């Protein structure tokens, strides 16, 4: 090989030819050397007798390993002045024709290296993986857990934990937690496809895969795998140390005018992606039944019965609850996740919610939209504690924690916030007022629905009730009047003509600075809040009187024998 120490401007020879340097056309094909006049297709083949893999030690630049396509491993400890050669047939149960797919110097130990071999061109599909721990003097096979018939293409080692290895194979990715002594399939979510190359993005701890299907895959933040120790795996639950969560304002939309040839994947979810482990999780009734059915294989599978199936359908799902607390011990957020055996992930979007009201129905009257559902604010940068709990059959118990999470703003705002000391109290007051407004919204919608229903009920009564008829007329007039005061003119809305700002509009403006910004509240926010409170103060007595009259009319209809109203 050649090397350059001048930013690739000049290369210098670092060794003699490290291959067998054979004449390809003089080698036997199909049992004998062929005539030159026989058809050849060397255009479709790579050059033979070449170095196919080269690795420099991260610890000592003088240590290099080279592997060739004609079955040779070479290594040097003096920067290429002297090379030690070993043919692959000297490795345990390895044919001399094996191709060196990959060779890697260990990132943590100068005496350790790994090599992957491939002999499929000769009809041999065995996995050949070897490791040396004495500088290439002896190589041992490390294929425990790799099925026979699985070609191996690429190996990479974690730059932090020397025991953590990743292996790209013909049928996906494998992982070792003990430096190759055992391998485990690690391809959940991947298609069955040859993984021809692997790389680690060290800053983000991401594993990048390149496949023979012309695709790339990225495993975001695999760092929890470093802590997959026997001690941790023996615990009931573990929260793996999360990486620092970066706080910023997201840009909406992934792309605009890139056409149909855009080649990209979704970014990781914004916020903190938190990985946790659960040792044991209760199986659902359906899972238990299916497991028993699979065990019967070709035998008859009995019908479980309708009662059992109904119980399966009605069974409530168990879950984990990730609790986020600030350093004062106050709960900032709670996130639910799946309760299942093994490793799972949940996402926290770095916000805290101030609850206001929640509606079972999503329908809203004009002018009230957006006044319920809670207020969401960005959390302050700093350190938080994570706790993992499980909820099984309604009972909540602890699993793990606390584990610290740091939240950091990507950059400070250009403007200092003169109202920073009033920020929290302002939005707390806004949330309390929103609760009241949302409650009246719900009562108003419910009262309006009753009035419309009373109109139908009145037509079903056989007796004449003038009092109810006139009362319903007045109620309908009041309802229409209040809807105009709350939501504005229907006629203007039909044609898009501007109208007065409603309570909802004012509240929306008052909320305008809370998310995704941490600036404010501004003078405009506070003035909008004050106007909303004044508008509500004026209309509240009229609402109360309307609700009272709706109740009175309902009693009149009930006494007259009308149908029972089911709210």
What are these regions (language model features)?
Residues 387, 403-405, 436-567:
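Mature extracytoplasmic or organellar-lumen-exposed domains after removal of signal/transit peptides
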Residues 252-319, 345, 423, 427, ...:
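Contiguous beta-strand segments within globular domains
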Residues 72-75, 82, 128-131, 138, ...:
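A short loop-to-beta-strand structural motif that recurs across blades of beta-propeller domains
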Residues 22-35, 90-101, 143-156, 184-204:
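Conserved blade-ending motifs and adjacent loop-strand segments that build the rim/top face
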Residues 96, 331-380, 401:
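Glycine-centered tight-turn motifs at strand-turn-strand junctions
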Residues 1-11:
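Single conserved hydrophobic/aromatic residue that forms the stacking wall/gate
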């Amino acid at each position: 090989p050649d090397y350059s120490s001048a930013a690739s401007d000049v290369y210098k020879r670092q060794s003699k030819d490290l291959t067998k340097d054979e004449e390809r056309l003089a080698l036997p094909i199909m049992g004998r050397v062929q005539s030159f006049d026989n058809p050849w297709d060397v255009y479709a083949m790579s050059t033979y007798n070449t170095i196919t893999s080269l690795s420099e030690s991260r610890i000592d630049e003088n240590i290099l390993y080279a592997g060739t396509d004609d079955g040779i491993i070479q290594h040097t400890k003096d920067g290429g002045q002297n090379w030690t050669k070993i043919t692959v047939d000297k490795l345990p149960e390895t044919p001399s024709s094996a191709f060196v797919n990959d060779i890697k110097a260990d990132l943590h130990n100068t005496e350790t290296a790994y090599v992957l071999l491939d002999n499929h061109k000769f009809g041999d599909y065995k996995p050949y993986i070897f490791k040396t721990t004495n500088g290439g003097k002896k190589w041992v096979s490390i294929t425990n857990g790799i099925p026979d018939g699985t070609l191996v293409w690429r190996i990479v080692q974690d730059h932090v934990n020397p025991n953590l290895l990743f292996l790209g194979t013909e049928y996906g990715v494998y992982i070792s937690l003990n430096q190759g002594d055992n391998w485990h399939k690690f391809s959940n979510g991947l298609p069955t496809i040859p993984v021809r190359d692997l790389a680690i993005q060290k800053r983000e701890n991401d594993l990048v895969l390149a496949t023979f299907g012309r695709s790339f895959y990225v495993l975001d933040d695999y760092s929890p795998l470093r802590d997959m120790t026997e001690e941790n795996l023996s615990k009931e639950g573990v929260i793996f140390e999360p990486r620092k969560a970066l706080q910023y304002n997201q840009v909406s939309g992934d792309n605009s005018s890139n056409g149909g040839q855009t080649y990209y994947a979704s970014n990781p979810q914004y916020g903190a992606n938190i990985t946790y482990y659960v040792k044991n999780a209760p199986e659902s009734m359906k899972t238990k039944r299916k497991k028993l059915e699979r065990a019967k294989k070709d035998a008859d599978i009995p019908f479980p019965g309708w009662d059992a199936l109904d119980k399966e359908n009605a069974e409530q799902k168990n879950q984990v609850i990730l609790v986020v607390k600030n350093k004062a011990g106050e709960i900032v957020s709670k996130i639910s996740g799946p309760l299942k055996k093994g490793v799972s992930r949940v996402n926290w979007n770095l916000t805290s919610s101030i609850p206001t009201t929640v509606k079972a129905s999503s329908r809203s009257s004009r002018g009230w939209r957006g006044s319920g559902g809670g207020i969401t604010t960005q959390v302050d940068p700093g350190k938080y504690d994570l706790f993992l709990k499980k909820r099984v059959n309604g009972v909540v118990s602890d699993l793990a924690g606390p584990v610290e999470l740091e939240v950091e703003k990507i950059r400070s705002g250009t403007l200092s916030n003169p109202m920073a000391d009033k920020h929290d109290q302002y939005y707390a007051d806004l949330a309390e007022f929103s609760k009241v407004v949302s409650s009246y919204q719900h009562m108003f919608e419910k009262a309006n629905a009753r009035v419309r229903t009373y109109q139908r009920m009145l037509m079903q009564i056989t007796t004449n009730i003038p009092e109810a008829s006139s009362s319903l007329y007045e109620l309908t007039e009041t309802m229409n009047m209040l809807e105009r005061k709350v939501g504005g003119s229907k006629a203007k809305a039909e044609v898009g003509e501007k109208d007065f700002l409603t309570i909802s509009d004012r509240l929306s403006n008052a909320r305008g600075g809370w998310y995704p910004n941490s600036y404010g509240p501004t003078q405009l926010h506070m003035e909008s809040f004050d106007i909303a409170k004044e508008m509500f103060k004026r209309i509240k007595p009229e609402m109360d009187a309307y609700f009272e009259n709706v109740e009175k009319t309902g009693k009149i209809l009930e006494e007259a024998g009308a149908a029972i109203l089911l709210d």
